[in-house]
Amino acid sequence: MLSPASRGVKLAGMERSRFLQVALDAAAAAAEVIRHYYRDDIEVSLKPDQTPVTKADVESEQVIRKAITDAFPDHGFFGEETGHEGLDAEYLWLVDPIDGTRSFVRGYPFFSTQVALMHRGRIVVGVSSAPAFGQLAWAERGQGAFLDGHDCRVSVIERLEEAAVSSGNLRTLASGPRWGDWAEVVRRVARIRGYGDFYHYHLLAAGRIEAVVESDVNILDIAALSLIVEEAGGIFTDLEGQPVGLGTTSVLAANRHLYPELAALLRVPHA
């Protein structure tokens, strides 16, 4: 739970903790940096893992990190671009300033800023900001999930034959023994799409699709989104049925009616 001292900020008639307000403010500051560089002729470098990085990635993470460390100097920080400090702190911030840098570089709007707060291993605040696409989602544990200022809930569809499922990166799944299980899911459901990145989690939380499956993610990509889906009433685990943690690399997220059946089809061991 959030500490009592963190509560008490009110905006737009809603009570928000200081933790959430700082996360929202940090994401807004990053959005200003991102808009400055978006669709500009920006230099792209490659990190050691061959993923792209730009000045926009680094500068937007710097403004997020400053906002957080100014407000909470004793908290830990784990960022995609500027590294980590205090991973064993009671409170740990998880930040990806531009999740979807390839989309950003190529000038299409499917990228986002992800800011989450973990308290003793559990995500308690999550903000997902997509400044070019024009969506902002957030959640605070026990307080519900919100998309563009409106509360959101997962769908109530109960049959796979009526469900829409979105997949992200499935490279590991494709090279393993459960690829045939995924094929059975594809055969069973009404629609398969690959909305990807932040967007399919926003759709899931808003009740517009029923499930998301990914086999190749990192915690910075999905920490905030996991809480948003859970607070919207969904279930969010990895493909082993484990809750989200620093080592999470895969996702099975769905509404509560369909999660058990999807977990069985995909042979999720601890669901």
Positions of PLM-derived features:
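N-terminal subdomain of lithium-sensitive/metallo-dependent phosphomonoesterases centered on the IMPase/IPPase/PAP
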Residues: 2-98, 257-258, 264, 271
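Residue-level signal for inorganic ion chemistry
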Residues: 34, 57, 68, 101, ...
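DPxDG-like acidic metal-binding loop motif
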Residues: 87-146, 161
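Generic detector of well-ordered alpha-helical packing
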Residues: 58, 62, 81, 97-100, ...
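Solvent-exposed alpha-helices and their adjacent loops that cap or buttress functional pockets
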Residues: 45, 85-87, 120, 138, ...
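An extended, acidic
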Residues: 153-271
